[in-house]
């Protein structure tokens, strides 16, 4: 998605959340931040090449939820790094992939499939 559309969508999301609870930042702004965050989402392609995204450790709180949109047969480098920093709630993008497919299936058929066995089957075949 081109940057202008992403910026518009970020603004729309921000309008739904009280301003003192929401900060949307680009990677180039993260080193200026003097706080940690409750939710960190890696949507870069860094995990596809086994690299860490350029996110400073100082913004990753052990109580945060850390999400990587990539997925693999084991936790991505980013998720492993977050776990080493003490983060207990780490998730990859496999559930989102299956959830989006299930939602599409529901829109076409009116039937909402159980995603848990699908995620389990896919995870075991990675």
What are these regions (language model features)?
Residues 19-90:
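Rossmann-like adenosine-cofactor binding region
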Residues 14, 45, 122-126:
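Generic secondary-structure transition motif, activating predominantly at the C-termini of alpha-helices
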Residues 7-11, 52, 100-103:
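Short, charged, surface-exposed secondary-structure boundary motifs
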Residues 1-18:
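NAD(P)-binding Rossmann-fold cofactor-contacting core
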Residues 14-18, 43, 108-110:
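Short, hinge-like loop/turn segments at secondary-structure boundaries
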């Amino acid at each position: 998605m081109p940057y202008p559309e992403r910026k518009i969508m970020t603004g729309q999301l921000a309008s739904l959340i009280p301003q003192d609870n929401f900060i949307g930042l680009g990677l180039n702004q993260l080193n200026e931040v003097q706080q940690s965050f409750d939710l960190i989402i890696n949507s870069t392609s860094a995990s596809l090449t086994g690299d860490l995204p350029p996110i400073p450790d100082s913004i990753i709180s052990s109580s945060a939820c850390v999400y990587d949109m990539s997925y693999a047969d084991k936790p991505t480098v980013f998720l492993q790094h977050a776990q080493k920093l003490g983060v207990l709630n780490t998730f990859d993008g496999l559930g989102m992939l299956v959830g989006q497919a299930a939602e599409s299936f529901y829109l076409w058929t009116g039937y909402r499939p159980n995603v848990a066995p699908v995620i389990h089957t896919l995870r075991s075949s990675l």
